[in-house]
Every structure is written in C-alpha cells, then in structure tokens.
Amino acid sequence: MGLTKVKHIILVLSGKGGVGKSSVTTQLALSLTSAGHSVGILDVDLTGPSIPRMLSIEASKVTQVPGGWAPVLVHEADESKGLGSLHAMSLGFLLPKRGDAVVWRGPKKTAMIRQFLKDVLWDETDYLLIDTPPGTSDEHISLAETLQKDATLGQVAGAVVVTTPQAVATADVRKELNFCTKTNIRVLGVVENMSGYVCPHCSECTDIFGSGGGKSMAEEFNVPFLGSVPMDAQFIALLEEGQRPTYPSGTTVGGKDISTKETETRTQEGNLVDKYQDCSLSHVFKDITDKVLVNVGG
C-alpha cells in the first residue's frame, strides 16, 4: 500500500464549498514543513482539484514508477533552514488541460480515490493531509472505508474541520462533525476561516462575515477550536503572482505586529514556503499547527 511510510494521516473536511478548505490545507502543509516535518498533500476533490494551483505547480506531471505513481515534488527538505520536504498528488496533474471538466459517476470516483490511496507511493512522510470535497458524498464514504480497511492502527490521526463564521456554513459543518462521529474519525479541531479581512492599505482587520460561529460550534460538539483565520489579499497575491507579502506600518494580526519595516528589503526570490514566512497568515497558522500537533500527539 502507498501509505506504508506515512506516519500520520489528517483529513481536511468542510460541510460546504467556498469556505477555503484547500487554502487551509495548503497553509497547514506550509506551516508543518516550516517546522521541519516532511509533508504530503493528497487532493481527492476530484471535480474541483485546486491544490496544484495553490502550490503553483500546475504544469507538473506525475511520474510512473514501479508499483505506482510518485507524487509531485513541491520543494526538497533543507536541514540548514529547518525545512521539511513537501510533495503533492492531485487529479489535476493527470488532466490534459487545466479547464477540463471531470464528469464522473460515483463508482468511478470511488475507484479513483482507492487507487490514489493504494498506488501513490509516498516516501517517508510525517504528515499526509488529505484535501476532501465539500459535504459528505461518495468520495468521503470511499475514503473512510478504505482507510479503515488499509491504514494501520493509529495511522489516521483525525480530521480538521473548516467553516466560516456565518450560520449557513456552521449548519452544514455540523453534518460533517456527525459524519466523523459515525465513521469513528477523531476531530482534531475546528478552524474558522474568513474570520475578518486584513486591509491591504492600513492596519485594520474587519469582521465582514461576523465571527465566533466556529468557536461556538466547537464548544457545542465538545471538540477543540484551533483558531480563526482572516482573509489577506497578500496571501492571494502570493499564490496567484508569486509576490512576497509586505504590510504597511501598524499592521497587526492576532496581536502580532507584522509590518514591513522601512529599512527592510524583501526580494521576490525564493520558493513558496520561503515567501509564506512573510505572510500575516503564517503567524496564525503556526498557532493552529501547534494545536494540531498537540492533539495528534506528534
């Protein structure tokens, strides 16, 4: 099985689309690699694979090796910087064109997910993050059944559930938490995404969608609340254009001053994980990642 060398498997779930689940998956991966862990991302959102674009590796192709597929390298480990390696696998790498639609019925989706779990040959990996489709569909059932059958005892660490502050999103995520209960998947915690907006021109962070819905839901279900993540236009520019984030004087996120100092010169050189260190959200996700590691026991 392709998961033999994987220590911990973490599912990233959401009750509905549009809550930024793939963004959370990407930033968890970047945060974990920054902490020195070797990380893999398996994108099983078959009809909307966005991980290749998030990681700026859309042009990459999967390599066939004896026994299966080798995941795509995002960046190598660098012990001198305390950086772990990052690999990814997605159906997006297998499509002839980026805009090609995946029009598959349930059985074909189920077969593809099982093939991903069995035939993608991960090297020594501390954490494998599985980016799932929104809701509780055939893909989720197939994923849970295959992991229960093939994963070793304790290998599936649990799930991180993503929501936004609005009531309509938290209502759908309640179904996801119930799904975890029925499939015996431990909930590592809830992330409230899009909780505030960091203005690119000043230091103000505004709760345009409200706040607190994710924390209230976590308390209701007696599961850990991992933290709130604001929206940051600089993070989007980093993913879309490769721009290193910079912030005006007085910008604070989570009580931390992340202003770009006037005497500081930031070049546009470096890979994604290097530039992400200058993003306001890297500080937010460091706290979230620390809580996830404690809950996993890693």
From Swiss-Prot:
Name the coenzymes or cofactors required: [4Fe-4S] cluster
Predominant subcellular localization, coarse grouping: cytoplasm
Ligand binding ([4Fe-4S] cluster): C199, C202
Q: Could you give a GO molecular-function term held by this entry?
A: metal ion binding
Q: Which GO terms describe its biological process?
A: iron-sulfur cluster assembly
Query: Cellular location of this protein?
Result: Cytoplasm
Coiled-coil regions, chain positions:
none
Q: Which residues are noted in the entry as ATP-binding?
A: G15, K16, G17, G18, V19, G20, K21, S22
InterPro entries named in the record = Mrp/NBP35_ATP-bd, NUBP2/Cfd1_eukaryotes, P-loop_NTPase, YlxH/NBP35
What is known about what this protein does?
Answer: Component of the cytosolic iron-sulfur (Fe/S) protein assembly (CIA) machinery. Required for maturation of extramitochondrial Fe-S proteins. The NBP35-CFD1 heterotetramer forms a Fe-S scaffold complex, mediating the de novo assembly of an Fe-S cluster and its transfer to target apoproteins.
PANTHER family per UniProt: CYTOSOLIC FE-S CLUSTER ASSEMBLY FACTOR NUBP2 (PTHR23264:SF19), NUCLEOTIDE-BINDING PROTEIN NBP35 YEAST -RELATED (PTHR23264)
Family stated for the protein in its record: Belongs to the Mrp/NBP35 ATP-binding proteins family. NUBP2/CFD1 subfamily.
Assembly and interaction partners: Heterotetramer of 2 NBP35 and 2 CFD1 chains.
Name of the featured protein: Cytosolic Fe-S cluster assembly factor CFD1
Lineage start: Eukaryota, Fungi, Dikarya, Ascomycota, Pezizomycotina
